[in-house]
Every structure is written in C-alpha cells, then in structure tokens.
Amino acid sequence: AHADELVSSVSAMQAVCQIAPYVDERSLVIAMDWLTCANPDLRVCTHDELSDYIRSAPRFIGSAKCRKALRLSKPGTDSPQETVLRLESDAYGLPEAHVNYEIIDHIRGSGTMKVDIAYPDDRVCIEYDGNYHYTHGRWMYDLDKRNRLRDLGFTPFVATREHLASKQKLNELFGMVARAIASHRY
C-alpha cells in the first residue's frame, strides 16, 4: 500500500471541531477566527462555510460549544491577540468592535488605513502592538499612522501583551476607551 493510503487526515474545520471538548471557549474562538482570518493566503474557509459545516455536522461531543464559539467568532481577524482583545472588549461592555476596519484618509486622499479594532461610530480604535511593531521602521510607520488617525478625528489606543497579561491593565485601557467613546457621544 502507498503511504497516502495508510494516512488519513481531516479538514481544518473538522479538526477545530474535534478539539472543542479539550479546550476552553476562548481558545476555540481563536481557532475559528484563524480559520476565517483576513489574510487570503492563510484563510482556510469563510465564516459562512464554517457555520454551514458546524450546522450540518451530526451531533458530536463539543457541538454545542462549537455553536457558541461560532457566535463569538468574527471573520477577518489577523491574530489571536486581536481575538482576545475583541472578546475582552465585549466582556467589558464596550460597543461591538469591528475587526480590521478600514478608515478612509479623505484629508490626504491617500487610500485607507486598517486598524485592528474599531468603534467607527464613536471614532475610537485600538491597535495591538506585538514585537513586530518595535523595529525602527515599523515604529515610525505606526507613529505616522496614529497621527493621521488623530487628524481624521479618531482617538487611537494601543494595547500590548502586557495589557492582555494583566486584568488590571486591560481594565484601565478599556476604561480609557469607554471614556473616549462617551466623550464622542455626549
């Protein structure tokens, strides 16, 4: 027999469903967001395809958990940290966050800027800065982008792994975001 006859595999969607009984809800949402990520080279399926797969699958251990995680999942997320930030934002009680939101730079007429998390009606956004953002070139790009966002009337905030590692720091950040949203509304 050939090797390909001896080895079987499952689809990525099936694999994510199979891990459901063994991982927490957040990890399952992160995995689902990864399947439907923004990067077309990494995206495995659309959110609708994932939804159809989970709905049409025969009942399995973890199927209820998968359906709940699917409701919390959002297509177009670029990183696990963005997913965690979005889920924590929801848990804090902030308005629904838009992921990888494109903001048109109508002042310069130079296209769009994508932000990790946005509350567009309130002109507030959050960027997650991982280690990738700490090269000189990327740092300068990020500074210019945030200045341009302010010029367009947005209030940008920055989250780091330190925020995700500390409930206190995360609550402080979300408190600032909530105040910025409130000041825009009233």
Give the positions of each predicted feature.
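Short gly/ser-rich loop at a beta-strand->alpha-helix junction or flexible surface loop bordering the NTP-binding
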Residues: 1-61, 183-186
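Surface segments flanking catalytic/ligand-binding clefts of nucleic-acid enzymes
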Residues: 39-186
